[in-house]
Amino acid sequence: VKIRQILEEKEENTLSRYAQKSRLTRGRLREEEECDIRPCFQHDRDRIIHSKAFRRLKHKTQVFLAPQGDHYRTRLTHTLEVAQIARTIAKALALNEDLVEAISLGHDLGHTPFGHAGEEVLNAIYPSGFRHNEQSLRVVDVLERDGSGLNLTMEVRDGILRHSKGRGEIVVRDGEERPLTREAEVVRVSDIIAYLSHDIDDAIRGQVISPKDIPDDCVRFFGPTHSKRIDTMVRGVIFESLRDGELGISISEELEYYMKKLRDFLYERVYEAPLVHDVFLKCYKIIEDLYTYFLKNPARFLEEAGLEDFYDERERCIVDFIAGMTDRYAFKLYEKIFLPLPWRIPF
């Protein structure tokens, strides 16, 4: 008996009837022989962890540029926090932890350098538009492994595509945005829980806001600390979802109200704060200038990207290249292309 089969039987005996069982996966983009040790979602998680795109997340901005301090979140630490929150919720609800972890670790692989500044400018100047969730799916489907992709399961791919979007609904009930699995719903709400709390934590550290600026009723409801905020939201998701099992992942109207109020506060006082917005505009220009330059100088683009030829339309290849950059790589490339180097006088 294969170890994978033993683990799949364990899932059948221990997971909720609402959980996505590995044995019942909808399959992969391309058929392949499955691992005899790891169930499919665990295999997907491992592929994501070992991908180059995952490693690059450590040098991509969450909200505050990493050079400002060692304790600010990066896109990688955000991803790990989402995975931890999602696994806590999944374990309590007897859902598939391997699946929530795989989706969590892959959900931001397509994020641009400089956080949402990079996403906004690429969406504005690329004719087909740009969304980081769609780019994350493109990373795992096409760009990794030199163009062959990671060949992930449909459930992980769906969860990556349908994770939270900006000021969208906290919990999606119906419609095209609702994920295929409960596990993907868990990741969606865990993503929101993570950034609602840690972006406030980082904003206080960066002196963009003070603890006294947080609305009093939000402090009373969530608690005064980072850990209390997370605990309140996680407990709210778990207990409401247990109560309304048939409906999917749920939160109370009261929790939804305060989560949205906290999110509105973040947008108004942090993301759009003068200090943050000033950096945003500078990063916007870096991405815009690189895109425009490469569009006009295709030979230079191929040289910098290490390509012999375009593998897709020119604009698409340029977007893939820029979206995959880390903050520091984008800085260095901008400096290399646009800033004059000092004269070197031989002695």
Label every PLM stretch briefly:
Residues 99, 103, 108-148:
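A generic, well-ordered mixed alpha/beta core segment in the N-terminal half of proteins
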Residues 92-93, 110:
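Alpha-helix boundary/capping segments in eukaryotic regulatory proteins
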